[in-house]
Regions:
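Short beta-strand-to-loop junctions in surface cap/lid or active-site-entrance loops
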Residues: 34-43
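Hydrophobic alpha-helical targeting segments used for export or membrane insertion
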Residues: 3-12
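N-terminal cap/lid segment of alpha/beta-hydrolase-fold proteins
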Residues: 16-32
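His/Asp/Glu-rich mid-to-C-terminal helical/loop segments that flank catalytic regions of hydrolases
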Residues: 210-236
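Active-site/substrate-binding loop(s) of hydrolase catalytic cores
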Residues: 27-28, 43-50, 57-181, 188, ...
Length: 236
């Protein structure tokens, strides 16, 4: 299986330098987590988009799949993960396969919360879960200026601190409400924003249910529009 993954990755990279794909790790139950890379790999402008971290909040996958299928962008380096919590998606639960809320397991202001399978159980320790460690490695590797996390179901874009400027722009491009809300303990955006000053990691809360096609396209537009603003402005 490992050889097949390697060969498929090499084939993608060889056939089209603007598209590649690789498995960056495995979930707690052994499912592959894959990242797709689109656009200009030589560009210093990096954007990361994650479609699903809570397994029962999967509407964002439609946006990430749309981005992957679209013509690769020019002028920036786009990294896309459809699902960082494949076990939770398979089980249709918020938590990962070990009953941990991955978005309370990051090592930024982490505190012990709840018990296994509680909605916001933060795990036995920060970074206890393979999925959060995979994200940590990837973010350290590519150091994206913008990271967008899709959630549900609040129908708004939320951010705090240094990420609020970029998040407001996304909200405008996507025609959504924006709210300044402090990050809970142990979240992915809070970790990145503290670990990499000057970057912008924020959350897009989609509506309940699946996204209609025109909204999928609108969110994909918001991603690329925000990235292009990044190309011409040091402060997004």
């Amino acid at each position: 299986m490992g050889i097949e993954i390697l060969l498929s990755t090499l084939a993608l990279a060889t056939s089209d330098p603007t598209r590649s794909s690789e498995v960056v790790g495995y979930s707690s139950q052994g499912r592959a987590i894959r990242v797709h890379r689109l656009g200009d790999p030589a560009s210093p402008k990096k954007v990361l988009v994650v479609g699903c971290i809570h397994g029962n909040e999967s509407a964002g996958i439609a946006v990430t799949r749309y981005l992957i299928r679209s013509t690769p962008p020019t002028g920036f380096d786009l990294w896309v993960i459809n699902v960082v919590n494949p076990d939770g998606r398979r089980l249709h639960v918020r938590q990962n396969g070990r009953g941990v809320d991955l978005n309370r397991n990051f090592g930024s202001e982490w505190i012990p919360i709840g018990a296994r399978w509680d909605p916001e159980y933060s795990g036995p320790s920060p970074w206890s879960e393979p999925e959060t460690r995979i994200v940590r490695r990837l973010v350290k590797r590519i150091q994206p200026q913008i990271t967008i996390w899709y959630h549900q179901p609040q129908k708004l874009v939320r951010a705090w601190g240094q990420s609020s400027h970029a998040a407001r722009k996304y909200a405008r491009y996507a025609r959504m409400a924006f709210r300044l809300i402090r990050w809970p303990h142990g979240t992915a955006p809070n970790w990145q924003n503290h670990r990499f000053p000057g970057t912008s990691s924020f959350v897009v809360e989609l509506a309940p249910g699946s996204l209609p096609e025109h909204r999928v396209a609108r969110h994909a537009y918001a991603v690329t529009k925000l990235a292009r603003v990044l190309m011409v402005s040091a402060r997004v």
